[in-house]
Amino acid sequence: MGASCSSCCGGKSRDGLYDNVLADSEREAVADLLQYLENRGETDFFSGEPLRALSTLVYSENIDLQRSASLTFAEITERDVRAVDRDTLEPILFLLQNSDIEVQRAASAALGNLAVNTDNKVLIVQLGGLAPLIRQMMSPNVEVQCNAVGCITNLATHEDNKAKIARSGALGPLTRLAKSRDMRVQRNATGALLNMTHSDENRQQLVNAGAIPVLVQLLSSTDVDVQYYCTTALSNIAVDANNRRKLAQTEPRLVQSLVNLMDSSSPKVQCQAALALRNLASDEKYQLEIVRASGLGPLLRLLQSSYLPLILSAVACIRNISIHPMNESPIIEAGFLKPLVDLLGSTDNEEIQCHAISTLRNLAASSDRNKALVLEAGAVQKCKQLVLEVPVTVQSEMTAAIAVLALSDELKTNLLELGVFEVLIPLTKSPSIEVQGNSAAALGNLSSKVGDYSVFIHNWNEPSDGIHGYLSRFLASGDATFQHIAIWTLLQLLESEDKKLIGLIGKSNDIVDMIRQIANRQIESDNELEDDDEGEVVSLAQRCLELLGQGNAKAHIEG
């Protein structure tokens, strides 16, 4: 990521190279080095005699020799980057501490080039490279600043280095240089700050160093790379609840800036802006603020793009925004329903499907009107078409959405006519506990106040052992929640006053026997909440027996 700002890597002419009188060893090293440079394509400067010649120049007291050494290191590392040992790195680190600007500039360029290699990243830090780089970041020379920051940017991509950099005192200078007037310095500094946002501890160090206001300010940069680095860094910072609170208190322009960036000409910036808003929208305040900042329009455009990362970031964001009840109607009115339904079938991306159906469920949560609009948009038809084929995580979301829609008395007949039993009943046999529970909850919601119970009769034994099989399995499961769902559903069916349906239940000896066992269950628990839940299940079972004309069974309830 870090870009070198060094452009001067040339050597000096042979004639009149040095005015000062050189030691014999230095004169010999210069002659050798010039010869090696003439055959640079075939010379390994990182070992043996070439490295010894370079090192002689490095440790000379002659500034011209030191400059030549640093420029040579910068040149050879520009075209030959590989893992090197301390014998190569120590001379370069020694040059970094030189007071001469030209030496500093070339040495930091060389080190930045070598810091592209994974092994070198670790060794540079182990050999104490951070301290001189931090000093160079505070240099008045822009080229030196640029190379030093670029090197730290590269070093910060290695996990082993991040915490060391965070504790080294580098974050303050990096934050200041992020405001540099030189775009190269700014890019390198914001890139380095981004690399420091991948762990909780480092993010906190970054916040403490005062990076947040700088990153927010730079969202309005005209440079796409700076926009991307700052947007991504803020997205990572917003993962933490404490940081979101800090952002809410101190950065009133943040949301509007991110909303504006969703209309950037750069897809990577658009994507990160939506993801940053997604992370912010973990909090209620931001869920509302994004809508108020006219964020729905740009999100809808991203949602309808053909670029998968944009779709994913937008649908993840709208999912979080849709959690707030006050946002349900604005999202629906903005035209999201049909595109969300279309996403369910237009991609096999599991994450996109999960976010899309979860959003539809959220939009249906608070009002029967919105439930009807979700149904009209074709959500249930699409779920029915796909639910038996999609991954388990998507099945769980789809069945949960149907269960929510089934809470509306006005929609129950529509749902039954759409044939949801064809998928809900088989899914009560799913290997997933969540899918089983959601499917059973949907069946339970549909069993209450339907009016016409003929579909329950028709599906009593089919498909997949029908309603009968589902009730029998759940009653026998030993799971208190599953038993509760099954008994509550049974009670709705028995209260339907549909004689044929009640007759089918009464003839199902397995079901009746299990209801009787539950009705006679003794409650022995030290937990009052468990007592209440268990007591309700027993009470429902007793009520079922009464409606079956077998209400003389004695139940023994303690407590």
From Swiss-Prot:
GO terms for molecular function: identical protein binding; protein-membrane adaptor activity. A lipid is attached at G2 (N-myristoyl glycine). ARM repeats lie at residues 77-116, 118-157, 159-198, 200-239, 243-282, 284-323, 325-365, 409-448. It holds the Pfam family Arm. One of its GO terms (biological process) is piecemeal microautophagy of the nucleus. InterPro entries: ARM-like, ARM-type_fold, Armadillo, Vac8. Keywords: Lipoprotein, Membrane, Myristate, Palmitate, Repeat, Vacuole. It is found in: Vacuole membrane. GO terms for cellular component: fungal-type vacuole membrane; membrane raft; Myo2p-Vac17p-Vac8p transport complex; nuclear membrane; nucleus-vacuole junction; phagophore assembly site. PANTHER family: VACUOLAR PROTEIN 8. This is Vacuolar protein 8. It comes from Neurospora crassa (strain ATCC 24698 / 74-OR23-1A / CBS 708.71 / DSM 1257 / FGSC 987). The lineage of its organism: Eukaryota, Fungi, Dikarya, Ascomycota, Pezizomycotina.
